[in-house]
């Protein structure tokens, strides 16, 4: 048995040292130290030895098993290190190659247009006022001189949530809320109200069930129609160019009296007539007027002392006109082929 153990140890160590990969090494471990290996067979034969030989052979067998286990462990470390080095060698990264740039996002076209208008009005002393998109019927209609059963309500087919709440059809409710809580001892009201609005329109190239509005409101003492015209002139020239002329046409809105719609001279043809202005030389931009006395009184404002004007326009329309967008749906479909055409200079990583 002594000779058998010595031969086994010598043969196993030779093969372990010659192992060139981890799979071969593991096969050798199973071959020599596994349940069916020669070491196990030798240990089973210990019972056949005499009482004098058994301790000596048992100790020697344990030494051989320990030696082979250590040899396998040592060889495994060597092979694992070689495998890692080989992998690193084959997967070397050339740090001098150009890197992959992170995706850069820019402000959406609508955001750019809205912020451009906000900046203009803030520069004129206006504040930004916001309100809930889920609105009370009272603020969306009644406080704006649109009592129940008023025919003008049909012009704004609405998404009702309950009998008295709906998705707002305009940002005018923010104006009503602002007037209710304003303290005129601190000065006049000068606010713009940007936000999303909702109407039951069928989506097409020029209509959407959800869109944005920016409405403006000024209320104070001695506010006149001339103030409204001056404000609209600044708006037209800022958004569409200094050479723009404006034209005010009589119109009707329940919450203003008198009411007018503003047209601007066509920026495409200079007023000569083209496809953009439909041959008229003018492009309709927004509705406006002097705040109706009933609206002031509904908000607790003395209409004999205070007056004001209001206006409202859609950033989508402004964007479509300025940038020749032929379908409002392009603004909402998130097609990067479209949105990347209007990258702003203000960027941020996505």
Curated annotation (Swiss-Prot):
GO cellular component, one term: cytoplasm
Main localisation: cytoplasm
Gene3D superfamilies, A to Z: Bira Bifunctional Protein, Domain 2
GO molecular function, one term: catalytic activity, acting on a protein
Catalytic activity: tRNA(Phe) + L-phenylalanine + ATP = L-phenylalanyl-tRNA(Phe) + AMP + diphosphate + H(+)
Binding residues annotated for Mg(2+), in chain numbering: 257
Entry's localization field: Cytoplasm
Cofactor: record remark: Binds 2 magnesium ions per tetramer.
EC class: ligase
E.C. designation(s): 6.1.1.20
Keyword Ribosomal protein annotated: no
Names of required cofactors: Mg(2+)
Keywords: Aminoacyl-tRNA synthetase, ATP-binding, Cytoplasm, Ligase, Magnesium, Metal-binding, Nucleotide-binding, Protein biosynthesis
Statement: the UniProt record of this protein carries the keyword Zinc: no
Matches recorded under Pfam families: Phe_tRNA-synt_N (PF02912), tRNA-synt_2d (PF01409)
GO biological process: phenylalanyl-tRNA aminoacylation
Family affiliation: Belongs to the class-II aminoacyl-tRNA synthetase family. Phe-tRNA synthetase alpha subunit type 1 subfamily.
Subunit and partners: Tetramer of two alpha and two beta subunits.
Protein name: Phenylalanine--tRNA ligase alpha subunit
């Amino acid at each position: 048995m002594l000779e058998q153990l010595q031969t086994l140890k010598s043969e196993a160590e030779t093969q372990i040292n010659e192992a060139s990969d981890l799979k071969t090494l593991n096969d050798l471990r199973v071959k020599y130290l596994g349940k069916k290996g020669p070491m196990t067979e030798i240990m089973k034969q210990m019972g056949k030895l005499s009482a004098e030989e058994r301790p000596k052979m048992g100790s020697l067998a344990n030494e051989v098993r320990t030696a082979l286990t250590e040899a396998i462990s040592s060889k495994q470390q060597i092979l694992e290190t070689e495998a890692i080095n080989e992998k690193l060698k084959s997967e070397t990264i050339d740090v001098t190659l150009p890197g992959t740039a992170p995706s850069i996002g820019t402000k959406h076209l609508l955001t750019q247009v809205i912020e451009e208008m906000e900046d203009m009005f803030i520069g004129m002393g206006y504040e930004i006022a916001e309100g809930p998109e889920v609105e009370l019927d009272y603020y969306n209609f009644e406080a704006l001189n649109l009592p129940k059963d008023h025919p003008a309500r049909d012009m704004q087919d609405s998404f009702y949530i309950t009998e008295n709440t709906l998705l707002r059809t305009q940002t005018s409710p923010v104006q009503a809320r602002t007037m209710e809580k304003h303290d005129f001892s601190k000065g006049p009201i000068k606010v713009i109200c940007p936000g999303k609005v909702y109407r039951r329109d069928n989506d097409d190239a020029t209509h959407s069930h959800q869109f944005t509005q920016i409405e403006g409101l000024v209320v104070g003492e001695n506010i006149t129609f001339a103030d409204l015209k001056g404000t609209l002139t600044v708006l037209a020239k800022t958004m569409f160019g200094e050479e723009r002329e404006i034209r005010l046409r009589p119109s009707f809105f329940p919450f203003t009296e008198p009411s007018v719609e503003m047209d601007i001279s066509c920026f495409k043809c200079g007023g000569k007539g083209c496809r953009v202005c439909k041959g008229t030389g003018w492009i309709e931009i927004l509705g406006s007027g002097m705040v109706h006395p009933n609206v002031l009184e509904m908000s607790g404002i003395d209409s004999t002392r205070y007056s004001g004007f209001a206006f409202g326009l859609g950033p989508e329309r402004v964007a479509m006109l300025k940038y020749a967008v032929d379908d409002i749906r392009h603004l909402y479909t998130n097609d990067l082929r479209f949105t990347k055409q209007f990258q702003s200079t203000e960027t941020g990583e996505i």
